[in-house]
Regions:
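Structured interaction and signal-relay segments at domain junctions
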Residues: 81, 92-109, 196-201
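Extracytoplasmic/periplasmic ligand-binding sensor regions of membrane-associated signaling proteins
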Residues: 99-173, 221-235
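Short N-terminal helix-loop-first-beta-strand/juxtamembrane motif that initiates sensory/input modules
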Residues: 47, 51-54, 80-99, 125, ...
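Solvent-exposed, extracytoplasmic
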Residues: 69-84, 156, 160-202, 209
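Juxtamembrane extracytoplasmic/periplasmic/luminal helical "stalk" adjacent to the first N-terminal
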Residues: 20-69, 82-86, 125-126, 139-142, ...
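N-terminal secretory signal peptides and thylakoid transit peptides that target proteins
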Residues: 1-13
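Extracellular/periplasmic juxtamembrane segments that couple receptor/chemosensory ectodomains to their
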Residues: 207-257
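Short, surface-exposed beta-strand-loop junctions and turns on beta-sheet-rich folds
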Residues: 106-108, 134, 198-201, 244, ...
Length: 257
């Protein structure tokens, strides 16, 4: 039963039912169990990403990071890399957008054209933008913080978290049943995470089913709820819940016919 797998992700979680409650349909059972489950899966992702962000903040406060000297910064980031198993790249960027990665050193590309970069220069943390990494080509989730010295932004530290590795981590840690489909949509409806790697970073319109487009619109418009739609000739029911950390909508679905 789905609830058994949920307990692997969230210790101590229980769902109480009154002894006199009327019998529920299989669809009702799925909706109740899935609502607990999707919030558990969301918690795994939020905990991981917030942990990466916290670690970056700690690194950004060090004298080595604030020095702006790559060799000094690299030592700090190398230690960070050892504790993150979902990263595609760990990097230090300068205000002009030039950057170095722990894996490759100086990069030929520049980050100044990234939509999130002005926020870093303004002294703001960044969590959740979806990009195809310039240095690795992997579909990645940006987690980054500014580095300041004497009140001035002198650079930024970032981790490009691989979407596929993060999705796999959730599935493995929670022992997710094979008949369930988990995905997370960003504010535009793009799939930040997906159990099926081929659908990561794609929009519902890319799949071409109008009922999925309508269901996605409903998901994006609400904090929590249930939808149904057709995909590849099958009817699918899904429950969803919003992450306060990223703003993503986490969706757990199952085919019913």
């Amino acid at each position: 039963m789905l609830r058994r797998h949920v307990l692997a992700a969230v210790a101590g979680g229980t769902v109480a039912m009154a002894s006199g409650a009327p019998a529920r349909s299989a669809e009702d059972d799925f909706q109740l169990d899935a609502l607990v489950a999707v919030q558990a899966y969301r918690a795994v992702v939020d905990t991981h990403l917030s942990g990466v962000l916290t670690a970056l903040k700690v690194c950004a406060r060090t004298a080595d990071a604030r020095s702006g000297n790559w060799e000094a910064v690299k030592g700090v980031l190398t230690g960070l890399a050892e504790g993150i198993d979902t990263e595609a790249a760990i990097w230090f960027a300068r205000p002009d957008g030039s950057y170095n990665t722990v894996e490759e050193g100086p990069a030929k590309q520049n980050l100044s054209d990234r939509a999130y970069f002005p926020n870093l220069l303004a002294g703001k943390d960044v969590l959740g933008p979806l990009v195809v990494s310039k240095s690795t080509g992997h579909r990645s989730i940006i987690t980054a913080v500014p580095v300041t010295e004497a009140g001035k932004v002198v650079g930024a530290l970032g981790v490009s978290v691989r979407s596929r590795l993060l999705s796999d981590m959730v599935i493995e840690r929670s022992s997710m049943p094979a008949d369930l489909v988990l995905y997370a949509l960003d504010g535009t409806g793009k799939a930040a995470l997906h159990r099926d790697p081929k659908r990561m970073f794609r929009y519902p319109s890319d799949i071409g089913d109008t009922s999925l487009d309508k269901a996605t619109a409903g998901i994006l418009a609400q904090e929590i709820g249930r939808v149904s739609y057709s995909i590849e000739g099958k009817t699918r029911i899904a429950v969803f819940a919003r992450s306060k950390l990223t703003g993503w909508k986490f969706v757990l679905a199952r085919d019913v016919g």
